[in-house]
Amino acid sequence: MIPDDLPISPFLEEICSTLKNSESRFLILSAETAAGKSTAVPPALLNAFPKKILMLEPRRLAVLSIAERISSMLEEETGGICGYRMHLENCVSEKTRLEIITEAILTRRLQNDPALEDVSVVVLDEFHERSVHTDLALAFLKEAMQLRDDLYVVVMSATIETKRLSEYLGTAEKPAPVIKVPGRKFPVKVEYAGNVSPSKAVLDEVKKCSPGQTILVFLPGIFEINRVKEELLESGMPDENCRLLILHSSIDFKEQKKVLEPLSENEVRVVLSSAIAETSLTVPGVRTVIDSGFARLNRMNITLGMEHLVTERESLFSAEQRSGRAGRLAEGKCIRLWNKNDVLNLETPPEILRSDITSLVLECFAWGVKDFSALNWLTSPNMAAWNEAVKLLKELDCIDEKNTITETGRASLKLGLHPRLCKVALCGFSEAVLNYSNYGRSSVQVQRRFLQDLENRLKKIPERVKIPVKEKSLAVLNGFPDRIARHAGKGLYKFPSGRVAHIQKKEAERISVFPEWIVVPEVDSGDSEGCIYSYEVLDENIAGEWLKNRLKTEVLVDFENNRLCKKEILCYGKLIFSEKKLNVSSEDYGAAVCAKIKREGLDFLPFNAEAESLLMRAAFYSEQKGMENKAEKTVLSENAQEWLLPFLSGQNSVSEKMVFDALYWYLGGAEIDREVPVQIVLSNGKKRKLTYEKLSSPEDKTKLIIRPVLEIIIQQIFGCFETPEVMGVPVLLRLLSPARRPLQITDDLANFWSNTWPEICKEMKGRYPKHKWDYKISCDE
């Protein structure tokens, strides 16, 4: 039975009826922390709809916790009416109608049954986390709903910006309905402690904490959790009445579950947690939250094909989620370890823009989508990231040259593995897969279950797809072909991408002779130099044999120490194996300049004021026409061979005139001169020079737009009554006194003459009595 004392209880009937009557069949539920949405909404939907209800949760511990809580509420065993599914662990039965599932399970289910025939409603909980899986599932669900008119979706979160989402789920004219529910029953007092260390804050709060209460401490990641734990242990914590627990996705699942155990009456509990405890989990007895203000995020370096773990300020939404943990049971407090005036971003960028999307792209190919623009995304993937993922999938034989998913690609989906690990598994090295998967740090029991499950799945894969390999290192190389690295001296290794990385310090200290070749499954790209966390040593013969058919011969023309050089190299990416100097020809100068531009940008080219003006005018033209801006300097750097190389033929230097002429030809200078002039004829007959500048948009001060600007002594615009325009955009007038001091800035001349000019005119007449001041008559001053 659903409790009637939850903040969300009075809204349940409205939620069900609004969803049933929603024209888009979507509903957004914005329910504050502790409203009871995860517990109460699924059973309410169960009573209102005939088929199954699926609720997606981003974390395994939340899946288990919610399934057990709902089952208890329904006075059932877990696996009865309410059950759960996650990788390696299911608890469902024939009578199960409500399933709490992890994200990857929903994707698999959609791939196997795109119409979800036995499901009435899919609930996407904690949607604000915007994982890759959730965004993909939502895009797939929008297509699945076209196959059935009785499939519904509820999007739930405590902190979410609803306007854009409701228009995406519906239309701009008819957005999806939004229901907002108040949550927290108890106030939370927020205190700002400044730069106090987390361990000191914990020790201070433990002294004030009553028995039977929990202090929940949010830290960026496992490194900080372990460091604070050590500091607390050194200070004498915990004692017989204080229990210290940690919560992080990398620790064993059994250890994670300990934080959900009930407290004893005499116990004070301190839980050191990552962001895993922000949502869905109800940690018993939390009355105090200590928030470090930081989060650990993955950032994908697309060019290098490596991820970089960064510690960043948490978002405002995240800070609200964290503080809300303290007000679920009684009046609580949140101690923020930063200053009140510190500025936080509203939300964290979605994972789809910052993480590895290789698996997502493979799922899309299996769905029948080969171009990301063919799916209706809430946030589209980055085009460069998509293209790099496709390139890697081709290297891994998951996609063929015709952009068709292969048997290897389908095997990856069946095995439930990242395409890289799938290749390792198909080589017959399941133990290596375990080591480089999330299960590598789990208990022995879980590891055995993972390996058994993988072996069972591998038996169903056709033998022709499997790869007979004897060496573990070669198996890993098959899955990480872009991560082969060569020793570059002093413990540094160079990758085909050009990135250099060092082996983790503790490991490096144990090595007497660094191997020539390694393959690196786990590496952080770093800011300027990466860090290698795990690797396999490659026998030089194996490396040589593997590279043999992958080496390419390239001719490079470039500047070295300001001298023009030409050489032929044998390489794999940026790993160079041999090079031979060649004679420089008269045509090589242009190629070298273009190579330098692509590498270093346009700064070394001689740009005069005329060329800079042309670039700004071309950008303005593109902006008004809604076209791609070919005048963007990053675009010009990439395309130097297209616009500059024809003008460099037979030359041995670059002049200002050459750069201008090349840009004028490439950007369509004649059309730009016609539409975006450098000089304008005012309605009083005077010709004046215009400039084009990047300025804040009048509608949105945070956005920069290009505007035509006219700086002019005010008498020179007498006799003009309407604001001049360029391509329909009003010219911004900077009106000056006879001494060229600023008087007014306006893009509405008629309004200026009527309302502002009379006061300015009085002052000008007093200061400059010999000048003419009738704005209605053209003046030669």
For each feature predicted by the language model, list its residue ranges.
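Extended active-site and interfacial segments that coordinate phosphate-rich ligands
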Residues: 113-128, 292-296, 305, 317, ...
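Short, solvent-exposed loop/turn motifs
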Residues: 185, 404, 492, 500, ...
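P-loop NTPase motor module signature
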Residues: 1-424, 464-466, 470, 474-475, ...
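Charge-dense polyanion-binding interfaces
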Residues: 123-124, 239-243, 247, 252-256, ...
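Amphipathic alpha-helical packing elements
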Residues: 493-494, 500-503, 604, 672-706, ...
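Residues in well-ordered beta-strands of folded domains
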Residues: 83-87, 101, 189-191, 248, ...
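Acidic, serine/threonine- and proline-rich low-complexity intrinsically disordered segments
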Residues: 430-500, 506-679, 721-781
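Extended hydrophobic-aromatic, low-complexity segments
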Residues: 401, 503, 690, 744-745
